[in-house]
Amino acid sequence: MKRKKTVIHQLISEKQRFEKAKEGGNMAAKDDFGTTKYIIHAEFEANGVVERPDVVGAIFGQTEGLLGDDLDLRELQKTGRIGRIKVEVHTKAGKTYGTILVPSSLDRVETAIIAAALETIDRVGPCEAKIRVIKIEDVRATKRKYIIERAKEILETLMEEEIPETQELVEEVRKAVREMELIEYGPEKLPAGPHVPFSDSIIVVEGRADVLNLLRHGIKNAIAVEGTSIPETIIKLSKERIVTAFTDGDRGGELILKELLQVADIDYVARAPEGKEVEELTKKEIIKALRSKVPADQLLTIVQQRKELFDKLGRERRRGGARKQEYTKKGSLNPQPQVHPNEKIVKPLKVLKPDYKEFEEFIEKVKNDSIALLIDENKNIIKEVPIRDMLSAIESSESIYAVVFNGVITQRLIDIVSEKGAKYLIGARKANVVRRPITLKIITFAE
């Protein structure tokens, strides 16, 4: 009677364990196999209907004491060397079939011994049974295979991502530096290079991108108008500095240039190549365009001459048409067409003023080299200095007859040159001059 109670109690305990394992589901199984090295895969067949607890009980019961204390399944499971045994069963035609999974963290030899011990089980519950080991799975090999496949995927993803080239990294750093160098100038906060506040000459461009492109190539005295409406800051700067208008080679650039020439005092005009914008020019194209700049006065003269030529041609055509109609009315009924020789329009030569002609050679020299020349009465060059050193050179020199330079004639310069007793002051253009000494003759390149 006591033995019967013990068996019933054991069956109840096995059933509770089965229900608990069933509730845990796959997660429990995953936890059991998480730290194992090997998994024993076996299948069984029983000549009768048995349940999972019967199979588990047979495994523990029939291997107890078979392999000694060191390989006893109960002791190994307590110490975690053997994981939870997973059994799946299904019944068909009065027989029970199923699979057994035994997780093991033992070494290969000990795991193989446990696997062989499973095949010694010949009964499950009241039924005869047979267990056959299919394979021993090396979990670490499976993990290694997973690691290799996953590493391939990660590497492929990494290689698909765009890795910036060295030049791109350098360009990113330079771009950040250029944007740091960019300043806001004037009440309108116009984008400008860092040299605009103190440079003697400035370059007026259309927009912020143009200023950044010039900064990229080392030109730091550019300022943008930011639109077709010319800011007051640009107008004010044009009266104090030597200004070069650098516009795009399209219709928009022409409109901005036209507006600049109307409201500001522009000294030189440079254009980007036809169809290109300043922001997309290379360093070579920028340098070439700036070297090819033309004086604004010369550009305006050409435009004015063309306008006068077209007006003259229009007047002659209108007069010729009127004479032809008048002759037809007053002449015979069948007037003969009058043949006129082709008339050539000859552009009158520009007559140089005596004073300008006297210094023409020196003017051409400073135009090309952007220097200042101090000349004595015999037309000998006393000093040849950069424009930035011109004032100090004048103050330290004697017997100055004329000063020729490619810059703006200011009131201060007039006063200094006059004090030195010079007779001529020749520059690119004049600023707002209030006092003009009688003994000093002031000439601009346009004159």
From Swiss-Prot:
GO molecular function term, any single one: poly(A) binding
Domain Toprim: 200-274
The keyword Transcription is annotated on this UniProt entry: yes
Record Pfam families: Toprim_4
Top-rank EC class of the record's enzyme: transferase
Alphabetical UniProt keywords: DNA replication, DNA-directed RNA polymerase, Exosome, Magnesium, Metal-binding, Nucleotidyltransferase, Primosome, Transcription, Transferase
Segments of this protein annotated with the region Disordered: 316-339
GO cellular component, one term: cytoplasm
GO biological process: DNA replication, synthesis of primer
Stored PROSITE patterns: TOPRIM (PS50880)
Enzyme Commission code(s) on record: 2.7.7.101
Cofactor binding note: Binds two Mg(2+) per subunit.
Catalytic reaction list: ssDNA + n NTP = ssDNA/pppN(pN)n-1 hybrid + (n-1) diphosphate
Annotated binding of Mg(2+) 2, by residue: D248, D250
Key word Metal-binding present: yes
Cofactor(s) needed by this chain: Mg(2+)
Positions annotated to bind Mg(2+) 1: E206, D248
Family: Belongs to the archaeal DnaG primase family.
Subunit structure as annotated in this protein's UniProt entry: Forms a ternary complex with MCM helicase and DNA. Component of the archaeal exosome complex.
Cited function: RNA polymerase that catalyzes the synthesis of short RNA molecules used as primers for DNA polymerase during DNA replication. Also part of the exosome, which is a complex involved in RNA degradation. Acts as a poly(A)-binding protein that enhances the interaction between heteromeric, adenine-rich transcripts and the exosome.
Stated name of the protein: DNA primase DnaG
Organism listed in the record: Pyrococcus furiosus (strain ATCC 43587 / DSM 3638 / JCM 8422 / Vc1)
Gene name in the database record: dnaG
